[in-house]
């Protein structure tokens, strides 16, 4: 909001009861609302804004909580988001994990601080905890190679994982995250959008004194074999919908491959599919 009114905004926020502060951090505040509620000094920022312009923008995507943090074995990654409109969501998420009474006595590792640097973004929809101390991550339009490297380092240093497999996805709005095209149904079964095809992948393991990470590139045709190896299996089962390409594409737009496994072989899906 600019240094000219930073102190006024902070003082206003600190004066609010808990519920109103939460509303401010999620719903934001306009110039007119702030002038009506706070003692604001001279500010170039204010002079250039219209009455209904936001000083603190609302966070309408905050409902998609699977993106801002990812529980990975015994730790939680507070993810640096890709789009500027969602960056503050991770700040709010961090405050919850660090200060909410529900987590005060919990024993878990906090990975990252939710504030990305440059292109280092990771969104939870691209993170799949497979088991066998392995993690599958989609290199999508929202999760960058830099972000995956940083996450892998944090996981290895904390002892939460031993292997990260990154799959190079198409950079397309229709396949925004890995979980829109591929999810697990049980320990060795995946449901996959037929149009996804086989993807180039990278196996990331802890490095040594000379290099922090060991990265191995895998050919697209080895995609399933690489994932099976990470799971400690000889092979994996892949299920796709028995439809023609047009019908499959239409169902994928409705997240047809987006399952939530609540137990091995027991999944929650969208009724529309």
What does each model-found stretch correspond to?
Residues 1-273:
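The feature marks the mature, well-folded catalytic cores of soluble enzymes
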């Amino acid at each position: 909001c600019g240094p000219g009114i930073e102190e006024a905004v902070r003082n206003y926020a600190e004066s609010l009861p808990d519920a109103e502060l939460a509303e401010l951090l999620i719903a934001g505040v306009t110039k007119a609302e702030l002038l009506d509620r706070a003692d604001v000094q001279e500010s170039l920022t204010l002079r250039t804004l219209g009455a209904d312009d936001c000083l603190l923008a609302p966070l309408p995507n905050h409902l998609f909580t699977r993106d801002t943090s990812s529980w990975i074995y015994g730790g939680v990654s507070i993810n640096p988001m890709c789009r500027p409109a969602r960056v503050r969501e991770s700040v709010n998420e961090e405050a919850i994990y660090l200060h909410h009474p529900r987590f005060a006595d919990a024993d878990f590792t906090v990975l990252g601080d939710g504030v990305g640097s440059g292109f280092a973004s990771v969104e939870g929809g691209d993170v799949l905890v497979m088991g066998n101390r392995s993690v599958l991550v989609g290199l999508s339009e929202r999760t960058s190679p830099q972000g995956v490297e940083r996450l892998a380092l944090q996981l290895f240093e904390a002892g939460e994982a031993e292997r990260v497999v990154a799959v190079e996805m198409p950079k397309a709005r229709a396949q925004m995250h890995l979980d829109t095209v591929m999810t697990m149904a049980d320990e060795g079964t995946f449901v996959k959008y037929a149009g996804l095809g086989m993807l180039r992948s990278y196996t990331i393991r802890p490095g040594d004194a000379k290099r922090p990470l060991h990265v191995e590139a895998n050919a697209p045709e080895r995609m399933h074999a690489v994932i099976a190896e990470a799971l400690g299996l000889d092979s994996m089962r892949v299920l796709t919908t028995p439809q023609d390409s047009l019908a499959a594409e239409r169902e994928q737009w409705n997240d047809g491959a987006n399952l939530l496994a609540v137990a091995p072989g027991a999944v929650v899906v969208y009724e529309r599919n």
